[in-house]
Every structure is written in structure tokens, then in C-alpha cells.
Curated annotation (Swiss-Prot):
Residues 24-156, 271-411 are annotated as: Disordered. SUPFAM superfamilies: Histone-fold (SSF47113). This is Centromere protein T. The gene is Cenpt. Residues 94-375 are annotated as: Flexible stalk domain. The modification Phosphoserine is found at residues 313, 333, 345-346, 357, 376.
Amino acid sequence: MADLSFSDGDPTVRTLLRRVLETADSRTPMRRRSTRINAQRRRSQTPYSNRQGSQTKTSARKQSHGARSVGRSTRVQGRGRLEEQTPRTLLRNILLTAPESSTVMPDPVVKPAQVPEVARSSRRESSRGSLELHLPELEPPSTLAPGLTAPGKRKQKLRLSVFQQEVDQGLPLSQEPRRSRSADVSSLASSFNLTFVLPGQPETVERPGLARRRPIRQLVNAGALLQDLEDNSLASALPGDSHRTPVAALPMDVGLEDTQPFSQSLAAFSLSGKHSLPSPSRPGVEDVERVMGPPSSGTRLQSRMSRSGPAASPSPFLEPQPPPAEPREAVGSNEAAEPKDQEGSSGYEETSARPASGELSSSTHDSLPAEQPPPSPGVAVLSSEPLESVTAKCPSRTQTAGPRRRQDPHKAGLSPYVKFFSFCTKMPVEKTALEIVEKCLDKYFQHLCNDLEVFASHAGRKIVKPEDLLLLMRRQGLVTDQVSQHVLVERYLPLEYRQQLIPCAFSGNSVFPAQ
């Protein structure tokens, strides 16, 4: 028989009554009064009374069997009169007389997948993310409970394993063939559905927090840098200069051929500057020779520069400047002063004057690298020869400062005691007074060290002990028979050190520290 549900058609009176007749039991669900009385009697009877009851039952069954056969014939005859008074016959009469159309909606209108009103009223929807349970309305006790089958049919069990698998897979419940179910099962039981709605994950707003952005590192384009250098050199170049060559135009093998360090080139230049003195006839030629070094290196650099082409743009780093006048004047004055010193002074003064001039020239050239700015990456490819010319053509500064005074390490060790003396006076002390204190401390420590050295060598000791210092203090007159070492400690040491050095009895015969 086809499965009847609310979705098949309109809920008319006829369909409702038909469902009630199909689901209603032919027998009354109430137990007879005689069966309840018999159950109560069974509980109250003893084993002896049970035996008597069994004998009477057998006789009563025989009598009742004959009476039943007679009663059946009478029931068939009186069924016509009793059917008019039962609710079942009344419902059948209503079905025969009631119209097929609905009383609410006279014209039958088919609505696809319409939700029944009874199920809507009974549906209890919970909050989002929880279990939604749709239950039908409770029927009067005359109908069967949902999930129970009609009498005489086997109860169909629900397998939880299949149910859990389908819920995990997110598939609808399997619709097994309902051939085993009879037409007596109510449509309300078939509409019993369990729908599980999984809680949706809340939308979280991702915040970056303290995550720092990676630094954007831009690569340096060497070609663009060299192009900018060429543009700057073209803008700052003079129209008549043809001896200037740009840094980018020089061949790369120049930097690879001569790779001597920068410090050696400066040292060689400073040594050559000591012995080469300019003559008044050729001041510019000797300056160029002194700057460029030996002729072999100069010619090699000129050949490299001539290969690069005469029409190349000049570079601001290699612009020739006029030779400085101050070093020549200073050297010339030294030349004039040397004959005068030779006439009126001894040979010792001559030798002392020449190293002084050498020191002056070397100090001027040593100070030049510190004054120059760091070279750009494009210039680092060049050899050390152009750098020599750049450093030589910068104007030099004459340094008149004399040699630095070296501080005596012995006096440097006495400075803490001098500071301690100025602290103990609790008043400002002049510098001359502090110098006298330093001299006194120097003399005292010298005598003390000499005495310790003599005593240690005489006694053959390698370690100075407190007894040696006490003996020296006696010889110096600081410790005598009237003034002992403990008296000096009491006078010049604070209390916390005094308690550790001087033995004292604090409880009976126990002395601290132990002697």
C-alpha cells in the first residue's frame, strides 16, 4: 500500500479519518476487567490454592468452550445493531457521505513539497549550532506510538553504526524499502526526522599583531651608478681639458694588473718626498715625477689612458689641481736654514734638524688618508696609482704640534693614591701640592721595593710574606717597640677591617681570629 503522508495531498477530513481507521486497533487497547482480577488473584494465591485453581480451570474451560460457540452465533446476529453505536461505524458512515474536496480549500491545489502545519506547530528549533529535533504532536492513546509497528509484525531496529556513518559523511538518512512496513504504521511516525546541524566556525578577524614587515632591500644597479657618474663628470668638465679620463672609461685590467696595497704606496711616496727637493727651474716636472712614482709605472698608466680614447669625458676624482705652494715654501725654508745651521752649529744639530723635517713630511702625508672621503664602489676597481695622484694633489696642512709626552707607568700607578689623598683632605688641593704628594709617594715606594728586593734575594725567597713587610716597617721607623703594628691599624684603618686584623677575645678564652 502506498505510503500516506501530509505531503501527498490536502489534509481533508476524509484523509484524516481514513488514517485514523488505518492506525486504530481493531481490538480495544484496554484490558478486560476479568483479566485484571485474575492477575490480582494469582499474586494472592498460595501453592495449595494454585493446585485447586488449576483443577477448577480445566472444568471451567470445558464449560466456557461450549458457551463460546453459542455466543459467536449470537454476536454475528447482533453485529448489525451494535455497529451503529460504535465509533468505527460512525467514521465509516462519515467517509461514505463526506466529499472528496477539502472543506477549507474547495478546489484541490497541488503544492510541491509543502511542510505540514502539524509538523510546523510541533517543531522546536534551537539556537544555531545545536541539535535540531523535529517531533510530531502527541496523538490520543488509541493510536500507536511512533516507532512501534502493527501487531503481528517484527519490530525494525535502528542500527547506530549506519546512522553515525551517514551523519559523518553528511549524507541524508538512507531510505530503505518500506515493504516490511504495513499500512497500519502512522504517517506521523514516518515524518519523525532527526536533523543534525553542525555548528559553524565563527569568523575570526585575523590581526597582524606584532608581526613586523620584512625590510625591502633594493638591489644597487651598477650600470645606473656609472651612468650617473658619467653625467656628473660631463656637467662639471671644462671644454678645453683633453687629458682627463672618466673612471668608467679606464680599462678593467689596470685594476687587476697593479694590486699593491694603499698603505705601501703612501709609504713609498713619503720616502720619495724626503729625498727629492724641487728646483726653481723645473717645479712642475719634479712634482709630477714625485707624484707618479717611477717612470715605468707612469708610462704604463699613460699607455692605458691613451688606449681608452682622447674624446672620453673627464672624471671629477682625477682633476689636476695646481701644485701646493706651502710644502715647497716650507722645504725651501729648510734649505735656506740648513747652510746657516752648518756654519754656526755643530754636526749634532744638523742631524737632529733633518729627521725633524722628515717627520714633518711623513706626518703631513700620513694625515692625508684620514681627511679624504671614502671612495665610491665604481672607483674601487682602479689601481693604487691614480689614488696616489689624488692624495698628493690635495692641499697639505702643516702640523706644528710636537711629539706627545709619554706618561710614566710608575706615576700612572700612583694616581689612585693621589686621588685618595685629595679625597681625604675634604677640601680643594692645588696642582702643585698634588705633585709634591706624588713625589713623596714615588720615593716611598721606591725605597720599599728596593728593600724588598734586597731582602728576598738575601733570604732566597720568591714570595713576599707579611713578616717581611713588618721587618721593613721596623727598619723604616714606622713600627717601634712603643708603637706596634696594631696601633697603626687602629689609627689608620676603619672598624670593619680592624676587627678582622686585630685578635680580640669575645667569649671566655676563645679568641677571634685564631692565632
